[in-house]
């Protein structure tokens, strides 16, 4: 599951990327409940959290000074998952657009 910022993903390349994600069968929602949906988190296997400033973009990978950390801790993963589910509940299901 992925939650993305609604306002920051209206450009052509963002829509193309979101369509690709949706076509792959990955659940995707857009969130406009906040000025910016700025979370950058991966929660894996209910016990590993990756977070940091890294935007999961080519620019972040090749040009910017970024950071990311992975922590294996079930309690932390649970807290991050609760935060994610809150954002998920506020999001709107993304519909493919061509």
Where are these regions (language model features)?
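Structural recognition of the beta-strand scaffold that forms the well-ordered cores
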Residues: 1-5, 29-30, 42, 48-51, ...
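Primarily the HKD phosphodiesterase
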Residues: 1-27
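Short, charged, surface-exposed secondary-structure boundary motifs
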Residues: 10-15, 38-40, 60
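Short loop/turn motifs at secondary-structure junctions and domain boundaries
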Residues: 32-34
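Signature of lipid phosphatidyltransferase scaffolds
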Residues: 37, 44-98
């Amino acid at each position: 599951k992925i939650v993305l910022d609604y306002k920051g993903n209206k450009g052509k390349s963002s829509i193309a990327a979101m369509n690709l994600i949706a076509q792959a069968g990955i659940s995707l929602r857009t969130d406009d409940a906040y000025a910016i949906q700025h979370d950058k988190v991966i929660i894996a296997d209910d016990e590993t959290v990756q977070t940091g400033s890294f935007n999961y973009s080519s620019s972040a990978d090749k040009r910017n000074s970024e950071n990311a950390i992975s922590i294996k801790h079930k309690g932390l993963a649970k807290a991050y998952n609760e935060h994610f589910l809150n954002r998920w509940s506020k999001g709107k299901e993304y519909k493919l657009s061509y």
